[in-house]
């Protein structure tokens, strides 16, 4: 082809161009767009792309559930996911990786309404898991307590303990929002509607009920616990909360010591009740260089907190006295009274000791034998202290603050005798009150079943005969106490887990032990739940329906994320 022929090549639309043996076909502009659009549709509709897109959506949905789960577990506001968690995650991913990776996090639905729905879904899922377990016919025990939230709405918390797999499991059974004016009968009706009506549980499987001794629970007009026991056909046992009983014991105090307590509280209120006084005392204590510069408030509902309050008042007694003199307060006069200050030292010690006893009875998965040991041990300790004070050479070693005060100050002998008599009367009163709230006859059944605490302590047939067991039970205990393998399990397992583990080999002893260990002995979990409620339902969130958040925050069950993912991601419209 000559150059001239190349110059005259047809370049019209739809024509062809021939260049050195290559034929180029000109495609119209409209056809070209259709061609690429078809190719694009093929790519987008390919299984690989669809799978990738579906996977990303599933990951975003799962991430949304996981974030909502953490928000509820940490008792955070629902807006925290979108306002705090997401921006923080994007900052971290952008810093460590790149902007493109960070932008992918925006596909995760984290609005406050979405988080709220996710928490409700998780709560219903956890509730269904728990109820399915309880509906299988296993034995369970409950503890219940009532309180009011920040919006003055009564709330009833019910916890359950049941046998699952290889140990006891404790979980929140229900959180019921009640009407403003409610009686014990109303509480029973609400509880029965929930457990029997909604959950379809059977009262015959309830083996224990624990509550405090308030009028709404045990009063002669309401008698909630009595109605619950009737519903179980008296197959369950009722335990008055050990912690509540110990708090009632600690309130037994003579008028003289009560005056010391009231004046100490008045002093704290005078200083802490005024922001100016509180700041001035803080500045004064800082200038002197003392260890603490603040006083502590006391609340009546936390009666035993007075131990820390009194200890702080005693520690800062000299600084408080100087401050009160400068303020020309009449309360300064009480700090000039040696007897008053000495009694203050004693009260700070005894309330601290009672507080330690209360802490020993708090916690999860404690068995009744541990509580029995703490109570009986403290009762004997009180008797020992009384004997020490009655001796010719009285000793105050058990009250370190009081002992240090006596050693560092010159106290009149007559004053010291008066104080010793006051302390002795208080310890005697404590012993009597302990015997009233923890009567020895109530513990007789526990003492008869002490073999449950350590079955390997009964190696001899003679010791087993004294336990008043049935012949079949005696034979099981003899075989059990002779097993070296099971003794090793006993050392490493909890008491409840041990008896559950051997339920097939020793059914009689195991069943008897489980029924005794299963009931709660305190309402500690309810008190813990109400503390969580105060964190969830604040003044800014006083309209929150706290039940779903409480369920997720306190549940012992672990969500099945695959099952949740199979549910509808968006609510029906």
UniProtKB/Swiss-Prot annotation:
Residues 1-51 are annotated as: Disordered. The chain crosses the membrane at residues 514-533. Residues 534-573 are cytoplasmic. It is a single-pass membrane protein. GO terms for cellular component: membrane. The keyword Lipid biosynthesis does not apply. Belongs to the FAM200 family. This is Protein FAM200A. It comes from Homo sapiens (Human). The gene is FAM200A.
């Amino acid at each position: 082809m000559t150059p001239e022929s190349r110059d005259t090549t047809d370049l019209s639309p739809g024509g062809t161009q021939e260049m050195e043996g290559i034929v180029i076909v000109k495609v119209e502009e409209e056809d070209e767009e259709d061609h690429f659009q078809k190719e694009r549709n093929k790519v987008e509709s390919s299984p690989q792309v669809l799978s990738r897109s579906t996977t990303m959506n599933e990951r975003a949905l799962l991430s949304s559930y996981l974030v909502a789960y953490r928000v509820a577990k940490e008792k955070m506001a629902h807006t925290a996911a979108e306002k705090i968690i997401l921006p923080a995650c994007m900052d971290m991913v952008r810093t460590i990786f790149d902007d493109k990776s960070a932008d992918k996090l925006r596909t995760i639905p984290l609005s406050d309404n979405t988080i709220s729905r996710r928490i409700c879904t998780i709560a219903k899922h956890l509730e269904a898991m728990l109820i399915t377990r309880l509906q299988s016919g296993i034995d369970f025990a409950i503890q219940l307590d009532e309180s009011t939230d920040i919006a003055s709405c009564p709330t009833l918390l019910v916890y359950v303990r049941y046998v699952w797999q290889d140990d006891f499991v404790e979980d929140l059974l229900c959180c019921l929002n009640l009407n403003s004016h409610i009686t014990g009968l109303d509480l029973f009706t609400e509880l029965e509607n929930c457990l029997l009506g909604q959950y379809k549980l059977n009262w015959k499987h309830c083996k224990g009920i624990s509550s405090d001794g308030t009028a709404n629970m045990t009063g002669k007009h309401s008698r909630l616990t009595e109605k619950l026991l009737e519903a179980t056909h008296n197959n369950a046992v009722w335990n008055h909360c050990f912690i509540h009983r110990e708090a009632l014991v600690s309130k037994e105090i003579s008028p003289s010591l009560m005056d010391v307590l009231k004046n100490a509280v008045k002093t704290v209120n005078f200083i802490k009740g005024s922001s100016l006084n509180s700041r001035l005392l803080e500045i004064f204590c800082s200038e002197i260089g003392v260890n603490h510069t603040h006083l502590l408030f006391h609340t009546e509902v936390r009666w035993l907190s007075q131990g820390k309050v009194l200890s702080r008042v005693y520690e800062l007694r000299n600084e408080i006295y100087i401050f009160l003199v400068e303020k020309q307060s009449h309360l300064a006069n009480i700090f000039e009274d040696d007897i008053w200050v000495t009694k203050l030292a004693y009260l700070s010690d005894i309330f601290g000791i009672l507080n330690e006893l209360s802490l020993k009875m708090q916690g999860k998965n404690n068995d009744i034998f541990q509580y029995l040991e703490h109570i009986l041990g403290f009762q004997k300790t009180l008797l020992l202290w009384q004997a020490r004070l009655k001796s010719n050479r009285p000793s105050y070693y058990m009250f370190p603050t009081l002992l240090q005060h006596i050693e560092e100050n010159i106290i009149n002998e007559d004053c010291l005798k008066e104080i010793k008599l006051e302390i002795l009367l208080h310890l005697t009163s404590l012993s009597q009150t302990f015997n009233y709230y923890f009567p020895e006859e109530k513990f007789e059944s526990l003492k008869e079943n002490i073999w449950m605490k350590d079955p390997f302590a009964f190696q001899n047939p003679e010791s087993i005969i004294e336990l008043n067991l049935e012949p079949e039970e005696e034979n099981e205990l003899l075989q059990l106490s002779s097993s070296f393998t099971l003794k090793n399990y006993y050392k490493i397992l909890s008491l409840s887990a041990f008896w559950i583990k051997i339920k097939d080999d020793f059914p009689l002893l195991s069943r008897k032990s489980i029924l005794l260990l299963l009931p709660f002995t305190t309402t500690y979990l309810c008190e813990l739940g109400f503390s969580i409620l105060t964190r969830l339902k604040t003044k800014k969130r006083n309209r929150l329906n706290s039940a779903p958040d409480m369920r997720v925050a306190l549940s012992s069950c672990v969500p099945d994320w695959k099952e949740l993912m199979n549910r509808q991601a968006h609510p029906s419209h």
